[in-house]
Amino acid sequence: GLQAQVICLSEHPDLPQQDLLGVPVSIQLATDEGVLYPINGVITDIQSGQSDGTLTSYRLTVGDAMSLMRGRRNMRTFVGKSVPEILETMLGEWQQRSAAMDRVFDFELLLDRGRYPKRAQTLQLDESDYGFLDRMTRHDGIWCFVKAGTRDGSASNAPVHTLVFCDDPMRLPQSAAGTVPYHYGAAVKERDSITRWSEARSLIPGAIRGTSPDH
């Protein structure tokens, strides 16, 4: 997924923060070849910072459509649907929630549908939509990444991003970046490179126990 924090400067110390939440944005990064590489997302959080009387700083948190799905919890049962069909159903529902959401993101399923039989029942048990999709796709060896633009590359008036779900790296096209070298240290190189590789861990629940929702 995508989660980035961007520090912006503005001449306006009283920007209407509520009007910026949910707005699609595009961050342009210059590559070593002088080409602009876009990162598209949605403003999910905004915080005003210090001001020197002329410029005011704002810290924006930019995420993808999946991060917005953390806010809705649901309990539902999918009957006779495969994993790709459940993905299409839930992502399609989010696109239809509002015209704004439809303009914000698209999705693409690069999946071998023959691997996913229809399930008798699939239960979303008081989970966020994000948590449910994350659990289901991890179980089946599906990963998700974000790419800028629409699924078919068509033009759009807003900075759209596409959620790509894939189960086989051989289905992906060759990256325009090619092979990215790794260089240890802070020395300036002629090409963009990876400069740090580190291990990270986080604490998660080992088990969840819930009482019956049937009162």
Set out the residue ranges of the language-model regions:
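Amphipathic alpha-helical and helix-coil boundary elements used as assembly
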Residues: 1-215
